[in-house]
């Protein structure tokens, strides 16, 4: 997509490809993989994940293994409304939520959530990296650069500007500690579950996090993995409710942007996912260290060629 992508400076060979959700993305990707004898592909964005998982069988027939579950599982987990609905039907506890079809339903659900006394959350059913996420509440700090709140009346004004009603999910606000959990599974059987406490985030990604032991979080994630039948790497995000229960609010059925933190903790989940994909064995158990991650920006300088 970008000729000056910073990642080009950290790899042996690079290509500019179409957007992950474009019609010819997978055909271009397959051609590149065959040309370079690539046998594993790692989707790193939702658009790429959906396109690649949809054509997974075609890749596999050519000896190219995508690190992801099948398309039906991927879509059901990625689409926030379907994900919450599916887990609720399987008796997995989830936050209170609603999939509104019009403005009037939003007003009704806001009252049920206890608004304006209690805030609630609104987000697109399909989006990544925190895009479109808002906390609906009456009071907010205007001078906070990370302010992601919106008043109900302003939310309604925004939605009324669209010709077609947006597909959104309304969800109860979870006030407790937040966890991003990287997991590795094999045909629905959890192999590794590594909770990481999200201490500080910038937009969607964590910039301060801590790999910790949390049995309640691990137990909930294990149930979710088995219910969906995830295969290989997945990331599951949870937050504690007011009743002190960790509840899932988002699932990324792919590697996460912060998977590197697990390597620092002693478990290289990305490497293990690749090994499983190509039929190699991985350690059944590896001790994990608690570790804190601080993320920062670094520059790459490109000198003009004379």
Which ranges hold each PLM region?
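ATP-binding N-terminal substructure of ATP-dependent carboxylate-amine bond-forming enzymes
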Residues: 1-68, 107
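Active-site nucleotide/adenylate-binding loops and adjacent lid/helix of ATP-dependent enzymes
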Residues: 74-168
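ATP-dependent carboxylate activation and anion-phosphoryl transfer catalytic cores
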Residues: 15, 202-203, 213-306
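Phosphate-binding site of ATP-dependent enzymes
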Residues: 146-206, 210-228, 239-247
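Short catalytic-loop micro-motif centered on adjacent basic/acidic residues
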Residues: 16, 40-43, 95-98, 169-171
